[in-house]
Each structure stands twice: as C-alpha cells, then as structure tokens.
A protein has these predicted regions:
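Glycine-rich phosphate-binding loop and adjacent beta-alpha segment
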Residues: 95-174
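Short amphipathic alpha-helix with an adjacent loop that forms part of the alpha/beta core around
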Residues: 72-83
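Mid-domain Rossmann-like dinucleotide-binding core that forms the NAD(H)/NADP(H) cofactor-binding site
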Residues: 1-71
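Aromatic/hydrophobic pocket-lining residues that form π-stacking "cages" and hydrophobic walls in ligand
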Residues: 32, 77, 165
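Periplasmic-binding protein-like
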Residues: 84-91
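Terminal peptide-recognition signature
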Residues: 3, 36, 56, 88, ...
Length: 178
C-alpha cells in the first residue's frame, strides 16, 4: 500500500522518467520498482549486496541495481542516471540520499516513506549541516519532497489499491515474496 500510494500519488511517474528506489528488494522498494516499470520508467534500484541486486534485476525487472556498500557507489549512481533522476522513492536516508540529491532533475518528486538509516539515531550524524544544501536544491529545482503516513493519509483509498494491485498480481505483472 505505501509503495502504490507514495509512487502514484506523490511520485506521479511518467513514461521515460528515471526512478531511483532505495531498499529496492524490501517489500516496499520491490513493489515501487515494479510499478515504476509498469508506468514506463527506467528503474534504478539501490540495495545492499550483489545477491540483492541480482534479484532486483532478474526477478523484479529493474533496469539497474547498485550496491550501496560499494566504495564508488556515488560514481556508479551518476553513471546509472545519465539523464538525472526524476523520482527518488526514499526509504533509507543517509549516504544514499546524499548521492541522489545532486542528480535530481528540475521538478523531481521525492515520496518519503521511511528513513531507516536514522531510526535509532539519538543525535544528528557528525559532519556539516546538510539542510541548507537540501533546501537550496529543493527551491532551485522546484522539487516536491513529501512525507506520508499511509493509514492517516491514504487509508480511505485502500479499495482502489486492492483492486488495481490485485489485478496486477493476478496478471503476473507484480511479483512478491511472503
């Protein structure tokens, strides 16, 4: 449900756009990527490890998947997104977001579903304050950055989700693992 509503309502994917998905092989990320492909996007997944990336490409149908543990992850992301990033589905935060930020296109959309990299944080990470850069980028590039709480924001649309997602699963367009 978060994948469906966050991507379709906030991300608003259009054919030919580049969608980057963090936590690409988790339940939400895997679904986001597959819906992105159904909508005609070029999908770049980000996952932790070669096996997860292989799964994203071979089973889920992503175009590319990058291992965020790689020393040159940021450089790989630049190469994987030669036309920039139109949608970044945020599940993680941290260094993945830092690598994505400079690649965002004008009018990019960022549905914020989670920030797993900072769930247990009790203080800000060391280093420079990145908020001014984030806000300047959001302003200059007119980026839509929107968090959402699925039950509160979209609970009333559960039947829409069940109908369309049920059809996609029935037609074998969306794959999932329990």
């Amino acid at each position: 449900f978060p994948a469906y509503m966050g991507l379709l309502d906030i991300g608003q994917p259009k054919e030919g756009e580049t969608l980057v998905v963090a936590a690409a092989t988790g339940p939400v990320g895997a679904t986001v990527g597959q819906i992105g492909k159904l909508k005609g996007c070029r999908v770049v997944g980000v996952a932790g490890g070669a096996e997860k990336c292989r799964h994203a490409i071979e089973v889920l149908g992503f175009d590319v998947c990058l291992d965020h543990h790689a020393d040159d992850f940021a450089e790989q992301l630049v190469k994987a997104c030669p036309k920039g990033i139109d949608i970044y589905y945020e599940n993680v935060g941290g260094k993945v977001f830092d690598a994505v930020l400079p690649l965002l296109n004008t009018s990019a959309r960022i549905p914020v579903c989670g920030l797993v990299s900072s769930y247990n944080a009790t203080e800000l990470p060391p280093g420079p304050d990145r908020l001014p850069l984030l806000m300047a980028t959001v302003l200059k590039k007119r980026i839509r950055l929107q968090g959402f709480i699925i039950a509160q924001d979209y609970g009333h649309r559960i039947h829409e989700f069940q109908k369309e997602m049920g059809q996609w699963v029935k037609e074998d367009k969306i794959h999932y693992h329990e």
